[in-house]
């Protein structure tokens, strides 16, 4: 597992930090561990899909943010955090790694600090109260 993570990290750095992945590949990866019938997929750029209210689910139980940049993370929070149910989990994949993601989260919550659980050097987890 460690070696695979190291290879992935090396690959990411080599590719300027970002990879593209088809929706089909995402579904194939998820189907190994989850029933994808209960997962809402929305293909497209964050700026396009999340600013269109018809694309948004009414309630979210698990919200995973993994877009790295300030603007996309800000849009995710603005449009999705209010839909996260009480007791729901938000995972911020790149809080400790990408400055844009961290700044967007810090700006969004401002003085109203949530408790972010430290998962590892990059990931933080929040349980909505």
Task: Show which residues each predicted segment covers.
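S-adenosylmethionine/decaboxylated-SAM
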Residues: 1-129
């Amino acid at each position: 597992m460690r070696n695979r993570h190291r290879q992935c990290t090396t690959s990411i750095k080599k590719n300027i930090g970002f990879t593209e992945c088809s929706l089909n590949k995402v579904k194939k990866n998820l189907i190994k561990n989850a029933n994808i019938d209960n997962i809402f997929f929305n293909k497209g750029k964050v700026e396009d899909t999340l600013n269109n209210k018809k694309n948004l689910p009414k309630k979210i139980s698990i919200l995973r943010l993994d877009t790295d940049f300030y603007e996309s993370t800000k849009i995710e929070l603005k449009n999705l955090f209010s839909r996260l149910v009480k007791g729901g989990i938000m995972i911020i994949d790149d809080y400790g790694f990408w400055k844009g993601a961290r700044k967007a989260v810090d700006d969004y919550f401002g003085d109203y600090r949530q408790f972010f659980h430290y998962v590892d050097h990059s990931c933080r987890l929040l349980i909505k109260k």
